[in-house]
Amino acid sequence: MKKYAQTAHLLILFFTLATLRSQAQNADNFETFARQHDSIFFSLYLKKDTQNYRLLLQDWERRYAQLDAATRKKYAAERADAHYNLACTYALCGQKTPALDHLGRAIEAGYTNYSHLIADPDLEIIRGEPRFAALAEPIRAVGDYLFILRHAAAYNVADARPWPAFRYDPAEKPELKALRDTYRLDSVAGSGNDLSQALNVLHWVHEMVPHDGDHGNPAQHNAQAMIEACRGGKRGLNCRGLATVLNECYLSLGFASRLVTCLPKDSLGIDPDCHVINVVFVPSLDKWIWVDPTYDTWVMNEKGELLGIAEVRERIILDQPLLINPAANWNHRYTPDKAEYLYRYMAKNLYILQCPVDSAWDLETPAAGKTMRYVQLLPLDYFKQEPAVREFSDSASGATYIFYNTNDPVNFWKRP
C-alpha cells in the first residue's frame, strides 16, 4: 500500500511537472510557473519530502537558467528561498550534509536574512556545525541590520562639503492655501497645542488615503492631486506618496516639515527597498519628531517623550528603550510589531537619510527645466562617500536631479 501510494505520488508529480513546464515554455510565463512551483515546494516542505522537493527544484533551476539576465535577477530571491527551504526540509529530516549543501546554495543565490537564519528552529540540528558558522558569518555584514547600523554610528560634524540650506514653502503659497481650504485642515488640526495638531494631521492623512506599496503614485506628485486620485477608495499611495501628502499638509498649516527617504547600506546592490517618512518641527518641543503616515506611527522613549529620527537611530544603536504609539496600524489590518518595525525594517533603512533641499508644494513632479535637489546624510562607514555632488538629467521628462553628500548630522538636522 505504501509503495503504491509513493508510485502514484511520483506519477502525479511527473504530470504536474510536465504541465508546468509546458505552460512556462509555451506561454513564456515564468511568473506563473514559479508561483505554482512555490506552492508545491511548500507542500513538500510540510511533508518533509526531500526527494521530490529536490527533483522539482532541479526542474525549476533548468527553466531559470534559460531566462535572460534581467529576468533571472528578478527571480533571484525566489531561487535563494527555494534552496533555503530545501535546506530546512533536509535539516528537519536529520540530514545534515544536504541541509548544509542547500544552505550554501541559498547564500550563493543571494540569501541574506541573517537574523532569521540564526533563529530559525528548522535549522537547529546544523546550527552547531562548523560549516554552518562559516556559511553564516559572511552574510552578517549584509543581512544583520542591527550589526550594520551599529557599525555606522559615527558621523563627522566637521565635514565642510558645501550644500544648500534647507528651505520650506510658506503656508500662504496659493497652492498650499488651496489645499488647506479645500480640506479644512485648520479644523483637522484642531485647537490644541502644536504637538496635538501635528499628530491630528498625521492621523487624518493615514485615514484619508490607504497605503499601497505595490503600485506607483499618480503622475502629479502633489497632495491635492494625489488625494483626488485616491478618492472613494479607487487606489492608494506608496510610502513616498503618503509622506508627500503629509508634508504638504504640514506646510499648509505653517509647520516646517520634510520628506525623509530612509535607505539601506545595500553593499551588494540587491535591495531596492527603502521607506519614506516625515519629520515635522514642533516649536513647543523645540525639536523634529518622527511621523510615519504609512503606519500612523510616532516613536517615544521610555518616558513617553516623542523622538526625532536622529534620536531613534541613536537609541537603536545603543540598545536603549523605544516605544511606538499603541494605535499604530497598517490600513487597519494589523498592528506593526515594534521589534520588526524598528529593530529590523527601520534598522535596515536608517543607514542613509535623504531629504529634499526644498520642502515645497509639488516638489517631485518631474518637468522639463525643473531641478530637484537632495541632501544625503552618510555615516563614515559608508563605502561611497564621493562624489560630493552628483547631478544627472532624466531624458524622458527633462528634469534635473542634484544630490549632495554630507557626514554632518548637526547641519542636516538644523532647526528651521
Predicted regions, residues:
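Hydrophobic/aromatic-rich core segments of domains that either
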Residues: 244-319
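TPR/TPR-like alpha-solenoid helical repeat scaffolds
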Residues: 75-82, 113-135
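Secondary-structure boundary elements
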Residues: 150-237
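Flexible helix-coil transition and linker loops at the boundaries of alpha-helical arrays
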Residues: 26-28, 63-76
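Low-complexity, Gly/Ser/Thr/Pro-rich intrinsically disordered linker/tail segments
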Residues: 318-416
